[in-house]
Amino acid sequence: SQKKYGYFTSEKEDYNRIIETLGLKGKTRHPLTFLLEAADDIAYSVSDIEDGHKLGIITLDRIKRTFSTHDCPGELVGLKKYESNMDLYVRLLRIKCQSKMLIKTTKEYNRRINEIIEGDFDSEILKVSEASKLRDVFKELSVYNFSNIKVLKCELLGQEVLSYLLNTFYNAL
């Protein structure tokens, strides 16, 4: 919780009014922010596998090795018959893992709801849930995407285009 963004001094009155209206204590985060944070992490970390596959960065072998390294090979059960169609394989794997992660994270949230409401819970709900191993798998797989030259070139090009557009618009004012 402490690493999350706060508010500007100029917003202090608004912040205090929100805290009072929601019945939160001091620096306690709203309980739903824990679920929102987890859902965001699950959605983006797992979707990276599809992007990596489409770019030819993440292969079936890499997927199997990474799941095995993190002691999660059971997640691949039932998908073997789709190995000849990697687009479908990766899509089904994403759906299966996202569903499992959402269920396990929600279960952990419900288990810790009193700590969360009281402001005694100061961690990411996904990290402490039974879904943390799967999260680690997808975080490791995403590293291959972000260190790949194709991805880096695309990001650099995007940055150049945005800089050009912003400079053009700024100078037009």
Predicted feature residues:
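Histidine-centered, transition-metal-coordinating active-site segments
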Residues: 1-173
